[in-house]
Design a protein with these regions (language model features):
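A generic secondary-structure signal for well-formed alpha-helical elements
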Residues: 19-26, 105, 157
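Signal peptide processing junction and immediate N-terminal pro/mature segment
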Residues: 28-37
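N-terminal secretory signal peptides
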Residues: 1-10, 15-23
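Beta-strand-dominated extracellular/periplasmic modules and repeats
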Residues: 39-171
Length: 171
């Protein structure tokens, strides 16, 4: 599948219990069929699973259930909508818990390093709605040495971690 670079306002999807890349075909299917099961039934797109990735050194368990995770930090606004769907049917999964965390616009993680202050900025949890969507208000993550800009994701179902991954933009 040809991968299309993600813009700041891109809808990022989690396919099955893992992150999915949205290629050119998926974008066309989304326009024509609205994405999700209708797009899959059309044959224009299927659920594509990505490999598990490390949670990295900056995970803090027990984050707050909240939509706005900025804690007032400045940066380019980003509304991140993640869809959790069944890998076999591409149908939405209601009630999954999506946990995200990332660096602030300056490339700093909350809870780590001198001057990080609050342990909660750019960290939060949302449950998916009936359409399988979890929405977060955040800022576009900043870059730091040795890594591409990315957002960490964990998906939980019935108390179990079913996916750990990272969302990033390809050059």
């Amino acid at each position: 599948m040809h991968e299309q670079p993600l813009s700041r306002k891109s809808l990022l999807r989690l396919a099955g219990l893992t992150a999915a890349s949205l290629g050119t075909g998926a974008w066309k299917a989304r326009e024509a069929f609205g994405g999700g099961p209708a797009a899959v039934e059309s044959g224009a797109v299927s659920c594509v699973l990505t490999p598990e990735m490390t949670e990295g050194p900056y995970y803090i368990a027990g984050e707050k259930l909240r939509r706005n995770i900025t804690d007032g930090h400045a940066g380019t606004p980003l509304v991140l909508q993640l869809a959790v769907v069944d890998a076999s049917t591409c149908k939405p999964i209601k009630g999954a818990t999506v946990d995200i965390w990332h660096a602030d616009a300056a490339g700093n993680y909350s809870g780590f390093g001198a001057g990080s202050g609050s342990r909660t900025f750019m960290r939060g949890i949302q449950r998916t709605n009936v359409r399988g969507i979890a929405t977060f208000r955040t800022v576009y993550p900043g870059w730091y040495q040795g890594r591409t800009v990315h957002i960490h994701v964990k998906v939980h179902l019935k108390g179990n971690v079913v996916h750990t991954g990272q969302l990033s933009r390809t050059p």
